[in-house]
Regions:
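Short, well-structured N-terminal submotif of metal-dependent ribonuclease cores
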Residues: 1-37, 51-65, 69, 107, ...
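Active-site neighborhoods of divalent-metal-dependent phosphate/nucleic-acid chemistry enzymes
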Residues: 55-61, 69-114
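Active-site regions of enzymes building and remodeling cell-envelope glycoconjugates
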Residues: 122-127
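Phosphate/NTP-binding elements of NTP-utilizing enzymes
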Residues: 45
Length: 127
């Protein structure tokens, strides 16, 4: 089973790796299992930059390229993912995280996240 990294995990991996748990760090470094990042995370970063809640050292495009150069794979949003979002229980209110949960369910991915609300859904969480 491959991994899907939550947005904060992607940011911490590149900017503040000391914030990652040992299990999260190990999962990110496990070359035998692919690590995906969602286009929804890229969108979330763009929104946070616009709201001045986040600043990257370079552009969003440079950040995405850096992730890809480290072996992370970009996961697009499929219509089936949005269909799943429409029926998910409202345990989690963040629309970006709800989409990540739907993607994890649809693509059979384990999610690397510190967010405990993910545990309320039928997915495997690594932290």
């Amino acid at each position: 089973m491959a991994y899907l990294a939550d947005t904060h995990v992607l940011l911490w991996a590149s900017e503040e790796p000391e914030k990652l748990s040992k299990k999260a760090r190990k999962a990110l470094e496990d070359g035998a299992r692919p690590v995906w990042f969602s286009i929804a995370s890229v969108w979330e970063v763009a929104v946070k930059i616009r709201l001045k809640k986040l600043k990257l050292d370079g552009s969003i495009t440079e950040w995405v390229r850096a992730l890809q150069s480290h072996g992370f794979q970009l996961l697009p949003i499929q219509p089936s993912h949005t269909e799943t979002v429409s029926v998910l229980p409202l345990h989690h209110r963040d629309p970006f995280d709800r989409l990540l949960i739907a993607q994890a369910m649809g693509e059979d991915l384990e999610v690397i996240t510190r967010d405990r609300a993910f545990n309320r859904y039928p997915i495997n969480v690594v932290w």
